[in-house]
Amino acid sequence: MKKIIGYHINKSGIYTSKGESCLESPFLDFLLQPEPDTIKVFYHMEYSISNLLILIGVTREEAEKLQHKNYLHLDAYTLKYIPGKYFSIAKGHYYKCPFVNFSDVNQYSSAKLENVTSKEACLAAALNAQETGEEVYKTLTGLGLNPTSLTSPIKVYEKEVLDKIDLPTIDDIPEDAGFYAYQTCQGNWVETFQIGHWETAYDYDINSAYPSELAKLVDIRLGKWKESKQWIPEAKYGYCKGIVTITEPYSPITYNVKGSGFNNLNYTPVGEWETFLTKEQIEFIYKWKLGKFELINGWWWIPEKESKLLEDEVTKLYLQKEQSKGLSKKIIKRTASGIWGKFLQVQKDGFGDKFNPVYGAEVETAVKLRVSDFVLRNRINPISIAVDGVISPKVVNDLGNENEIGRWKLTDTASCISVGTATVAMKGKEKNADFSLSYKWLMEEIKRDPKATEYSMKKMSPVTLAVALNGNWEKLGELREITKTVYIGNNVKRQYKKTPEYGEDLLNNYYKSEPWDITVISNPVEEPDH
């Protein structure tokens, strides 16, 4: 059992959850003090490191190296820094030299920095970091893990669980099949279909959507791959290049637009375009009569035997999540979803060691199709879709056992205000993330100024190393006010015949959308080099 020590640093010095402080040099030696069986955490890493660099007199040139190369040699010391994730100090260049590393608990519970200036407030921040770290540590050990840092839940889970499972990777997939599969990965689906205000709306989501699909994945080494321009119905997985034609106004088939103008966004247009789709996506198009697909070429995986490699571990995580609450539940959920992320992980030096575009594609597209099936089957005109959830203006009955993994559940019934894509809020459902839209805040702003065309949220944010090096070096470590603006009637992902002009219009009208025609937003598909 390890103990947790919290740290907070400002321009006056270093403060710890043990009630200690260091207000003069040598600051690095203070941080290096040996603490056996201890995990050290920052209340807000980027803020603390910015101020530590000021305390130890780092020059701009040295800071540039730390930011861009992630390490810096200072006399006998070596600093390593990945912003918001990891920081370490080593003293000396020999085996078992003094060494310490830190994690950032701000990723688990958003830190408030506005009033953390006095000694008492700094010590309280350090204690808060310790308490958050203890909850994270308790959650991970409850999963049977033995973390030595709190940098990433999925990292320790990967080391102690995933690495012990013999999983197929990109090396087990024909190169072109892997390329086809990767092209079907378009990212999470977030889209708003209606704008306005509803006195009653219903928030549905899939219970552990990504884990439920992870549990279904089978070992692709127990079968054979076949390239064919013909449809192969017995294939379990298929990745097809072809011409899709979408004729219906609601469809889960996305088109990614890169660059300016329409921005880098996923759209769900109507029309005809060349693309890559999974076998399941094509079957979905025909099941719901959304259009058609003209097959040019495909890669197909035909099973000889089916073995579900992740089912047991995913089920364990799910049961643990259902028995948890608060931060612990969020950490377990994040860990389970992080498994999918490993299958699509791309690093600076190439693919991650578990990179598997087949698994990544199957999970991602399956969730989109589950959401679309729910919408179409229940004849919902959705207000919005956010990855694995649907906000609906109508109630859906007969959901079955909502507590089972992969089943639909009603998570909230409340008033809802929708401004545009990713700008939707349910009353009473406040989120901790920075600049998350609050129903209460927006309603108050509209009532205060009903004729406004935009509303701005403000918060204090640290001048981090990256920000300071971008023309604000003298302000390193200070707090600055940043703003996020909610614009009324400025939604480009779908087209509206009429849009709200002022805030008050949102409260008095409903605005329905239609998909763009592909000819308005299209750009060419890039072919691989062979």
Label the model's feature ranges.
Residues 6-20:
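Short conserved beta-strand segments at catalytic cores or DNA/RNA-binding microdomains
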Residues 16-530:
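Conserved acidic
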Residues 1-10, 201-204:
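Two-metal-ion RNase H-like nuclease active-site motif
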